[in-house]
A protein has these predicted regions:
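Charge-dense, helix-prone N-terminal extensions
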Residues: 2-153
Length: 153
């Protein structure tokens, strides 16, 4: 039985300083995951959730690995995992998406995903994370990071 979904909103930067309101379908299982976290982790998760939906209206939410929120569009885009003192954002990019802002904090040698760990009181580099989400989605639409990586010389 598919979960009952609700509509949520996020805003998307249009590049000229303007913002566009984006409506997305929220999975209540993701709401439940976020809802039991401490307030500071809830705020981080909600901001990341809004960013990934702002990257592309077609991103869908689901739960994988029993209870972990995943955001998918023609493949995994990212996942959330709250830890004791931070929230991990797993970026499923195969290590091929550029990180000019240096937001990647772990998994540099991982063949599947890298991590952005966001700690309490830290400000999310929303522009950098949004750019990475957009590139991961573009890569997914082009056949996925595995195909793109294999095509490299």
């Amino acid at each position: 039985v598919p979960p009952v979904v609700s509509e949520r909103g996020a805003s998307r930067h249009l590049g000229n300083g303007a913002r566009e309101q984006v409506t997305y379908t929220a999975d209540p299982r993701v709401d439940a995951y976020i809802g039991v976290l401490p307030d500071w982790q809830q705020a981080i998760c909600r901001e990341v959730r809004d960013l990934v939906h702002a990257a592309d209206r077609e991103v869908e939410e689901t739960i994988k690995r029993r209870d972990r929120p995943y955001f998918v569009l023609q493949g995994n885009v990212c996942a959330l995992l709250a830890a004791k003192d931070h929230v991990n954002v797993f970026l499923y990019d195969g290590g091929i998406v550029a990180d000019p802002e240096g937001i990647i904090t772990g998994g540099h040698d991982n063949k599947t995903a890298r991590t952005v760990a966001i700690r309490r009181e830290e400000t999310i580099n929303a522009a950098a994370l949004l750019a990475m989400f957009k590139q991961i989605i573009a890569n997914n639409r082009a056949g996925g990071w595995r195909k793109l990586k294999a095509a490299r010389p």
